Amino acid sequence: MSEAMDQPAGGPGNPRPGEGDDGSMEPGTCQELLHRLRELEAENSALAQANENQRETYERCLDEVANHVVQALLNQKDLREECIKLKKRVFDLERQNQMLSALFQQKLQLTTGSLPQIPLTPLQPPSEPPASPSLSSTEGPAAPLPLGHCAGQREVCWEQQLRPGGPGPPAAPPPALDALSPFLRKKAQILEVLRALEETDPLLLCSPATPWRPPGQGPGSPEPINGELCGPPQPEPSPWAPCLLLGPGNLGGLLHWERLLGGLGGEEDTGRPWGPSRGPPQAQGTSSGPNCAPGSSSSSSSDEAGDPNEAPSPDTLLGALARRQLNLGQLLEDTESYLQAFLAGAAGPLNGDHPGPGQSSSPDQAPPQLSKSKGLPKSAWGGGTPEAHRPGFGATSEGQGPLPFLSMFMGAGDAPLGSRPGHPHSSSQVKSKLQIGPPSPGEAQGPLLPSPARGLKFLKLPPTSEKSPSPGGPQLSPQLPRNSRIPCRNSGSDGSPSPLLARRGLGGGELSPEGAQGLPTSPSPCYTTPDSTQLRPPQSALSTTLSPGPVVSPCYENILDLSRSTFRGPSPEPPPSPLQVPTYPQLTLEVPQAPEVLRSPGVPPSPCLPESYPYGSPQEKSLDKAGSESPHPGRRTPGNSSKKPSQGSGRRPGDPGSTPLRDRLAALGKLKTGPEGALGSEKNGVPARPGTEKTRGPGKSGESAGDMVPSIHRPLEQLEAKGGIRGAVALGTNSLKQQEPGLMGDPGARVYSSHSMGARVDLEPVSPRSCLTKVELAKSRLAGALCPQVPRTPAKVPTSAPSLGKPNKSPHSSPTKLPSKSPTKVVPRPGAPLVTKESPKPDKGKGPPWADCGSTTAQSTPLVPGPTDPSQGPEGLAPHSAIEEKVMKGIEENVLRLQGQERAPGAEVKHRNTSSIASWFGLKKSKLPALNRRTEATKNKEGAGGGSPLRREVKMEARKLEAESLNISKLMAKAEDLRRALEEEKAYLSSRARPRPGGPAPGPNTGLGQVQGQLAGMYQGADTFMQQLLNRVDGKELPSKSWREPKPEYGDFQPVSSDPKSPWPACGPRNGLVGPLQGCGKPPGKPSSEPGRREEMPSEDSLAEPVPTSHFTACGSLTRTLDSGIGTFPPPDHGSSGTPSKNLPKTKPPRLDPPPGVPPARPPPLTKVPRRAHTLEREVPGIEELLVSGRHPSMPAFPALLPAAPGHRGHETCPDDPCEDPGPTPPVQLAKNWTFPNTRAAGSSSDPLMCPPRQLEGLPRTPMALPVDRKRSQEPSRPSPTPQGPPFGGSRTPSTSDMAEEGRVASGGPPGLETSESLSDSLYDSLSSCGSQG
């Protein structure tokens, strides 16, 4: 308008001057100009108005978008919290169910004499149904009726499935489930699983599996099976398999099948029809068995032995039970021999059996089974596949007697079931399983079902082939057991069979037969990622026994468990275990542990248990491995793969996922080690592992789902391992198996030791897993996925939260440790939340979690290299399957995230949600907590390993982007500045305070006062610390170099660290653990990480750096808490080990280097240098002081670290008792550094708990002195530094003390209390600190 005005003015002016010339024109021109002016003004005003309107609209849109985003984030957060609550509830329920089942099973075992009778009754009824075996539907209905006794719902399902003709209905029901919304379907599956568990408990109590097996194993059974193998009887075996599955997993399995299949029943029905005479009875038996253990037992007996066998079944059952329990070890050995023999001669059959003519039944079965797997169980069941398998099992049974029977029961029945339920139900069951962690795999399974079915068939068919090829029971018998054995190992191989295998693994002898079947099938499905996922989810589902499809698998697991239980005693427990595990992996783990203990009572089964473990563990691993590997790996694994499966198992804990996974993995590791060591079923245990490992690597995507499944299995197995070989087996199984069967004994000790610590046990196993598990390394990379096993463990925290999550975390900080914890103590539920918290972090970035996993794997690998803690290493490895770890990591991270939120729902959550960095002040992120969280999750993904710190930074950056888009950028910048200022201030204060603790031991540092004497020297470096803080704040100077230097060591140490993380979660997280590592690596790294990660890293640095890396990862939350104490947001990934490199871009380079070793955790500290600065300073003085202290002369130099590492590593690697020497090297450095810083930090908050332990130097290894504990525990080499060890511990604890300042006190206490609790507390504290900082 001004222009227009000017123009008019100018116009008139011009005309005016020229008025004289153009007087006449002036009026017209002026009017014209005025008119134009008005027009321009009107136009301008209109444009201005339009502009304003547009601006308002735009702003409104922005506001709406921002609101929507925030709302969505908040809703997501709420949903997460709700999911966590539900998971917890499920976990509690599952644990209750499992405990009840275990008790019931124990009672049943006590009344074993009556057991055969019970099965007898069912046997006869199944017998009658067999009378009308021709009528598949008739038989189906009959079966449903028995089922109906115990489970009306099942009856309905069975009837539906059976009546439809099996194939159609089964397929239809899964679609129906599919049709349901995933949420509803999950709910339905969960309800089904819960009901199944309820029903299963009684069935399990009946522990018909044992009787069934004996009858099946009875001489009659093999013949009928063989005879049937050739003809209609073959179908019988198939139905028998369901029965068998139901027998051991009995109700759980049946329910799962039925449930999963609303049409699994169809499958099962088909199965029954398969063996018209025997199949129906078996189906019925299954029906009955699940519902009525006796029915199941008799059914299996009847099916397997046929009517003729039916009569002897009872006697055979009782005899077999007694024999099995007494001779389970021998049977397993025999099975092993068979497997070996068949491996040599039947390897081909296994791989090519299904195709081979010998497999005529098998091929027949294969197509049918494929069909079945695809969703037409009837054709599959009807086909000879199940029968073939059964015959094979029957042969096994014949050859080996009760064990073969078990094998047949487990293998034949289970394998087919696993195959068809796994696949047909896979979708449903997998979904169920997925409910817990890998829904997507489950879903994929539905589509992949055909493939997986085929894979399963292949896996199973080969076993079937083997079985059918040797219609003359003997060959089949050996082959079946062998298959079973391999499958056990391969259990992990195939998702669907895998669950079966897992169950079989639990079942021991059964494991092997099924393993044979499952193996071929497992590997095939696992090979294909989809298949792998599918199969794995089935396994998960099986474990869950929620999903219809996987139900079979769970059934298998249950059966295996039952079988194991039968062998071991609490067969009922296993089924719940699978159920619980699937429902809540952690729960399963936890429950399984208790059940395992219960099972443990059944020592006769104990031999079976150990072998079962190997099977279960291998199975778990096989799941992972087989998926990757193929039938071959599974088959191969029997002998050679045995170690690999172990690794797979070790890796497993890393699996997502699920924390329970971790827990399970830990359990698996334990189981494996236990079984292997106890039974010397190294082959069995080991074979599966190779498969698992392979599977893990190849089927990462499957692994994610599969990991969870294995985890689930593992928990079951772990339970058993824990029960029977609770100490050695539980912990050592996985890792030991992986590293060396010999370690089993050590793991046993370790397990017990850990068990004493509670979470520690698992932690250690997890740690070993971490170390050994490549997956773990991978998980490290996958940061969120599994590396934050500890964090992710939290996802499964309920069950294996502490153990699973943390062990996972080992590399990732949380997952490894948690798994360890959970297995160690079912208690870790408090810890579980911790795990959950941690889990969520890793979970945040599931993709990254995978990356984290990778990172963890890398770290793990170093850990493996540093088998200082062989047990730990192997175990860590076993639990952390690459995929499993990833999956577990993701899940656990998610859970962790959710739990973290739950834990510090108020400010903590908010702070955490609000950008980890900027909003930990509670400043900028309060608006978008969900967004922040999501960013964090993204960050986690980005820095899977470094996760937290990196995640924070990434998150911050992402959030900043979002904020900018949402006009929050300014707020974010302010928050960042504030955060930095706070960090610096806190760093200063912390450094001063920590030094103070050294001297005066002020307030928070009062605890440090305990370590004052030791800290005094360290605190001499207080100035140095301050300087370092300043340096870090200013520029994160030297850390990069030093960091890297230590990192290589850490790389060496990292694996250990990873493990240690798990072991030291309490300590490491407490700032103390990381301290040592940090001391050496952190000072250099801190500066670099200082800016971005400073706040995150400081704590991670100080907390997670040293051993803590693994340890820290295990207790990433603690680390964060510690950091947060310093002013670091809890989220810096404790999974630093894995994620640290990713944690902070700045520190990333250094961190990346560090990830190889504990340093990964350390890198986060670098990132958080500002916050950590004080810690770093502490650390630096600590390093100098440590050197001065003489903790280890080498401590000062990073290279020295290596020399010092031996001793320090031992300290640092406390978790890795065996690996003390290797692990300690990096830890030494860490320890040195940490001694100083941690002493301060720990002194304050952790000191009370840690200090004494530290001073104890003892390996109290109690959860109490997490860092110290670890170190003390590590203790042999620790002893000399013990004095310093305590300071060391103190050092680490000091880090904690930082956290303590912010509420880490609880954490500090928890370290002593429980690894899991420590983790939880530290996580919580870290969140709180975040809030307080804000």
Curated annotation (Swiss-Prot):
Biased composition range(s): Low complexity: 468-481, 810-825, 1079-1090, 1197-1206, 1313-1334
Residue positions, PTM Phosphothreonine: 659
Matches recorded under InterPro entries: NCKAP5_C, Nckap5l
Coiled coil: 28-106, 956-994
Motif ((S/T)X(I/L)P motif 1): 484-487
Polar residues compositional bias, start-end: 358-372, 519-547, 638-649, 1110-1122, 1235-1247
Protein name in UniProt: Nck-associated protein 5-like
UniProt source species: Homo sapiens
